[in-house]
Regions:
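Surface-exposed interaction patch
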Residues: 26-30, 55-142
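Gram-positive cell-envelope targeting signals
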Residues: 1-30, 73
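Intrinsically disordered, low-complexity sequence elements enriched in Ser/Thr/Gly/Pro
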Residues: 1-2, 20, 111, 142, ...
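Short non-domain terminal segments
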Residues: 113-116, 167, 193-195
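Exposed beta-sheet edge/beta-hairpin loop segments within beta-rich domains
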Residues: 64-67, 134-192, 201-206
Length: 207
């Protein structure tokens, strides 16, 4: 009987040795998200002129005669990636001004109505920008009194090393030239503009 048990014992030992030769180990992989640092130069203030009689107004590099004129302003992308620019604008009228949602050109109103809108263009040279000829609801933001308007994806700016890294913006529009109550120095509009930026892939095509 002892001899018959030997093969079974030998097989059991071989299995035990084979199992003992197996080992397990694990690797823990930690993922880190590499996010770009967004750095944009944004002016803190700007000047807007209400110019009902279309008098010549001397700006930095030109003389303007429009009814709504703003000093030249621009943001500059100093980031390592392109950015998409979203804009939020809120108006606040003083004096007898009423901020309206459509042009006053051809209007017979005698109220102090002002039609003002925000425009931004991506450019190579902040001193040389081609502006739109007229208001476009799809591209511009109308300024309303106490009402915040938001428009997403207004422009895409190239990275700091790209020539088209400037977002040049202005406030423009028109107003009633001769209201019943004459224009005076107390009539003014303050506009609060907030920019928000979304980083884009480095190979994004810049329009």
């Amino acid at each position: 009987m002892k001899k018959r048990l030997l093969p079974c014992l030998t097989l059991a030992l071989l299995l035990a040795l084979a199992l003992a030769g197996r080992a397990a180990a694990r690797t823990v992989v930690t993922t880190t998200t590499n996010l770009p640092t967004i750095q944009i130069s944004v002016p803190s203030t700007a000047n807007v002129y209400i110019n009902p009689n279309r008098l010549p107004v001397q700006l930095t590099a030109s003389t303007e005669t429009a009814q709504i004129i703003s000093s030249p302003c621009y943001i500059e992308n100093l980031s390592e990636v392109p950015v998409r620019v979203h804009v939020e604008a809120t108006g606040s009228a003083r004096g007898g001004i009423s901020l309206v949602g459509e042009t006053t050109a051809g209007s017979t109103s005698k109220a102090k109505r002002v039609f003002m809108y925000f425009e931004i263009q991506a450019g190579v040279d902040p001193d040389d920008v081609t502006w739109d000829n007229e208001y476009d609801a799809d591209s511009h933001i109308v300024i309303r009194d106490g009402d915040t308007k938001t428009k997403n994806s207004m422009v895409i700016l190239g990275s700091a090393e790209h020539e088209k890294r400037y977002g040049v913006f202005r406030l423009t529009g028109d107003c009633i030239e001769e209201p019943t109550e004459a224009w005076n120095s107390r009539d003014s509009v303050t506009v609060r503009i907030v920019f928000t930026f979304t980083p884009l892939p480095v190979d994004t095509e810049i329009p």
